[in-house]
Amino acid sequence: MSFLEDRKALTREKRLSALSHFHGTLEGLIDETSGTEIKQRVRTYSQIHVDETIYAFDVLSKIEDAAIIVNGAIGCGNIGLTQIDEAFGWYSTNLVERDTILGGEDKLREAVIRAYEEQHPKAVFIIGTPVVAINNDDVNSIILELEDEIGIPIISIYTDGFKSKTPVTGYDIVTHSLLKYLIDKNPEETKPFINVISFSESIEDIAAIVKSLKALDIKYQVLPRFSSIDEIKAASKAKATVVLNPEEGGYLARELEEVYDVPYIVTEAPVGFRGTKAFLLKLAAYLKVEDKASKYVDEVEAELTRSISKHLLDGKKIFIDASLSRIPAYARLFTNLGGEVVGFGAPFVDLENRNQLSKLRFLSKGITAVIGNGQYFEKANAIAKGEVDIYVSEFQGSSFASDEGATVVSTRNKSIYGFDGVYVLYDSFVKAIRLSGKLQGADKGNYKISWKSKSGNWYVKQEVS
């Protein structure tokens, strides 16, 4: 059943029973997430973390011909400062205390007109914040009024920053608004390209996948990240859709299939040799270019076999902190290189991505599993207990692992997708191993020994309804 009749997307907690509080073992996590609903837990102590507003802003900021307005106080308006591109610009309504009482509609109207006159965008996105959600400002009236005046789509992104503990909800909210207000609802014909859905991947990751698609002569468009408004509108005309990270883009792919009959080719994340091979062969089978794809994959495999030592990580204990959809691919790759995965962390588990846990059954069932958005103090506890040699992370804030004596391999701003990503990860490990000896006697970290001697799930409790 399509969710597009709803005004906005449900949170992951409501739609898919997302769990973002767990600290235990792989076996325990599989057991707790195996029912028709996932048993919820809470953290009685929690570190600060990102929210869905930040995730929504991040993906919208990569759409090339759109203007973004952060409708809220100046603190929320500053989220654009995280952008690396100094030329990137956005707008804030800069709501103050008076606006929370009398309403901020006039400031929003002014911001929309200014954005249109200065940037001449093809669409304007208005991102919600806690102040607007609490005030319940009439954003839709402003949209209806100004759309007639300026003649382009003005789209409300119904984020609030506090109703969900799962930031990926921000991607769902963006997806819902794009489907409901922007994508062409009456495609006249199917075009000879596929949709490649990307929400969080770097431009380097996209380039690695595009390299393989071009080798197979597959026409494509990437969306919504690094796309244009016209490309997003054309998503309903594609011959098929693939998703680079299923737990982020699956919602968009399924709705395109259900509402617009664009087939969704379900694949795993194209990380590592096996993951990339499975991704390409599944796509090639649908597009009937299997022979070409098989030849291409065989050539790449032969080159990888010549270039990579399968004993690089012998004797190394590894903790993986990443999106759950990518952890099985990481774990396979690191195990094939001789490493031992002793634990992992992921932001959430829900009814859809929990199938990734079964792909980890080749690991010891007693390895540590930490589910939470951030929560580095718990991961420091796990690293200290597990005597981890290498901490692999997709996220910001990895210095705590170095403080615990682990060598950090960060995949942020690196191309880890596709076959090229195997070389990038391999080279990163070579450098990490070279540096690991220099960390002997490293500082024991910012977290007290008394905390690290406690059970890692000290603050994680069963939710009582």
Would you name each region that the model predicts?
Residues 1-465:
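An N-terminal assembly and electron-transfer interface module characteristic of large anaerobic redox
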